[in-house]
Amino acid sequence: FELYFAISGIGAICHTINPRLSSEQLTYVVNHANDSIIFLDLTFIPIIEAQIAKFPKTTRYVLMADREHMPQCNIPGVMCYEDLINKQDEDYIWPEFDENTASGLCYTSGTTGNPKGVLYSHRSTVLHSLLSCIYNSGSFAPSRKILPIVPLFHANAWGLPYAAPISG
């Protein structure tokens, strides 16, 4: 989940993508969102390889792996996640921005046409996550375990990537 914090923390937008979208919908979503970097699990390499020519705005692909576990693939310029973070300065100065700045982006399933984008601000993300922590809502606590059943690309994962750490 560190990407949730890192991406929105630098002022970028964390766009989680539904890998079950059709080829056409996936192309639409990636291009409509202007995704410049795609982080992907190794299991999604075939999906990206089949679509990569249709993503002209995407300039970087990062596999969630270390150098030792990097597979051969046909994704130009692909890099491994561990190499990316190891190149960064540990003394990063976090930017400041308005709480209404965009933080997350999810798309609907597109049952009535192209998927629709839903943009979440930092403020809405915090409020959504805090609401999940309320006793009669999610009733999260340090002594509890959370098994998310909602996909990360659905409704910003119901705030779970942020609510769980808030709860300890």
Specify the residue positions occupied by each region the protein language model found.
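Conserved pre-ATP/AMP-binding loop-to-beta segment of ANL
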Residues: M79, N86-Y107, N114, S139-K145
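Residues at the C-termini of beta-strands that transition into short coil/loop
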Residues: V62-D66, E82, Q88, V150, ...
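Structural core segment of the AMP-binding/adenylate-forming
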Residues: G9-D83, F97
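Conserved AMP-binding A3 loop
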Residues: S103-L130
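Conserved AMP-binding/adenylation subdomain of ANL enzymes
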Residues: V126-K145, F153-G168
